[in-house]
Design a protein with these regions (language model features):
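A charged, well-structured terminal subsegment
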Residues: 97, 101-102, 146-166
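A cross-taxon signal for low-complexity, glycine/charged-rich
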Residues: 1-4, 172-174
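Acidic, glycine-centered active-site loop in nucleotide-sugar glycosyltransferases
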Residues: 137-142
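Acidic/glycine-enriched connector segments
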Residues: 24, 46-121, 129-132
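Glycine-rich beta-alpha loop segments
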Residues: 2-64
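Short acidic-hydrophobic, aromatic-tinged amphipathic segments that line or gate anion-handling sites
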Residues: 82-86, 128, 143-152
């Protein structure tokens, strides 16, 4: 039933403290990604990260948490693979760079830094109730804005399929 057999990795980013609406969005995104056989990668802690992992696990998905500290027990209960880094917020770089697409849900300045890393690395970024950018007073539409969890996941998967990291992963598994 897992269409993509976990080769595709999509990062879901957002705040460690989030609204009930963002929690529900993240959980639904996790469920939908797992149903498509996508590996979910995130910062491994609470809030949006916990909700997306909980959603993914409820549908039998695979979750990876890139942790800021030295201790794997800091990971939320729904992380399958906790990656201990000891590098604090610098862990935002591998969260994003490991993925073929990124879904941002809400978020504070940590999420904004991840959005910037994704844009700089040409990794497609889909936004649900998240930051908007402007440059010289002009709207910068680099973040692909969507209105629902379903739209976010559909868009992320279709863009991830065209990303160079995914093409390499699919070749390796043949």
């Amino acid at each position: 039933a897992n269409i993509l057999s976990y080769e595709m990795i999509i990062a879901v980013i957002g705040d460690s403290s989030c609204s009930p609406e963002e929690t529900k969005l993240a959980e639904t995104v996790g469920e939908l990604l797992a149903q498509q056989g996508v590996t979910v990668i995130c910062g491994g802690l609470g809030g949006v990260m916990e909700a997306v992992c909980r959603g993914a696990k409820s549908k039998g998905g695979l979750t990876v948490g890139i942790l800021p500290g030295q201790d794997s027990s800091m990971a939320n209960s729904w992380v399958d693979i906790p990656v201990v880094t000891g590098i604090g917020e610098a862990r935002n770089v591998p969260v994003v760079k490991s993925a073929q697409a990124v879904i941002a849900i809400g978020g504070g300045y940590g999420t904004l830094s991840e959005i910037a890393y994704a844009l700089k690395s040409r990794i497609p970024i889909i936004g649900l109730n998240t930051w908007s950018l402007s440059r010289n007073e002009r709207e910068d539409d680099s973040i692909i804005r969507v209105q629902s969890a379903t739209e976010a996941v559909d868009k992320a998967i279709s863009l991830a399929k065209r990303h160079k990291n995914y093409e390499i992963a699919s070749l390796r598994s043949q």
